[in-house]
Amino acid sequence: MKQKKVKKAGLRKGGFTFKQFFVAHDKCEMKVGTDGVLLGAWAPITKAKTVLDIGTGSGLIALMLAQRAPQVERIDGIELDEDAALQASENAQQSQWSSLIHIYHHDIYQYAQQAPTRYDLIVSNPPYFEPAVACRNQEREQARYTKTLTHEGLLDSAQQLITDEGLFCVVLPYLIGEQFIEISQRKGWNVVQRVNIKDSADKPYHRILLAFQRQYQGETKPCNIEELIIRNNDGHYTTQFQSWVTDFYLYY
């Protein structure tokens, strides 16, 4: 007798369903992806009371951090693209953390001048392509290229907005992350945590997670370095990666 395939329960379209929330992203140029999930799952948040997500997009990282940290009192998301900001706000309002997450349609440079508070944790999954061939629309160009948010400007804005002992965390392609470290050191930041990421054991590093603290009076702090391998040689997720996402992904 021929067996019938068991269908998974229907999932909502136009976004990504996590265990405790849904992220609609059909109005966002940059969709839910592994980079954002990695940053949201890793960013050190246990001591934070106030959190800022720069370039929040769909609000994915803000929602993940809200789930991870019940002690947090405020999470603000800043987004330059109006449609994405509206969708992030809708995602937050439809979640169980609607009173915690606030989304602002704003330029981060202007926001840094008038922010209502300083932040214990600032996160960003920033654009990293240098301006080159124009994208098909302005919104996608903002999401992908450093034209409207340079790495120098991002570091300067974070420095204005962070608390004295706060952490600033980013996810970037590996080689661009190394360049980002050089820029950060010139601007008075210490790298205190980093995770070098490769897709499988036999592949080179392709992503990097970085956590920075402000440098005072030339002091340097030790950097804790880890490695994350996403897939085994058979293509399945490693136990290590599964442990990172088990609180979020439906089938882990």
Curated annotation (Swiss-Prot):
Its EC number is 2.1.1.223. Coiled coil: none annotated. This is tRNA1(Val) (adenine(37)-N6)-methyltransferase. CDD domains: AdoMet_MTases. PANTHER family: TRNA1(VAL) (ADENINE(37)-N6)-METHYLTRANSFERASE. Keywords: Cytoplasm, Methyltransferase, S-adenosyl-L-methionine, Transferase, tRNA processing. It is an enzyme of class 2 (transferase). GO terms for biological process: methylation; tRNA processing. GO terms for cellular component: cytoplasm. Belongs to the methyltransferase superfamily. tRNA (adenine-N(6)-)-methyltransferase family. Specifically methylates the adenine in position 37 of tRNA(1)(Val) (anticodon cmo5UAC). It is found in: Cytoplasm. Pfam families: MTS. PROSITE patterns: N6_MTASE. One of its GO terms (molecular function) is nucleic acid binding. It catalyses: adenosine(37) in tRNA1(Val) + S-adenosyl-L-methionine = N(6)-methyladenosine(37) in tRNA1(Val) + S-adenosyl-L-homocysteine + H(+).
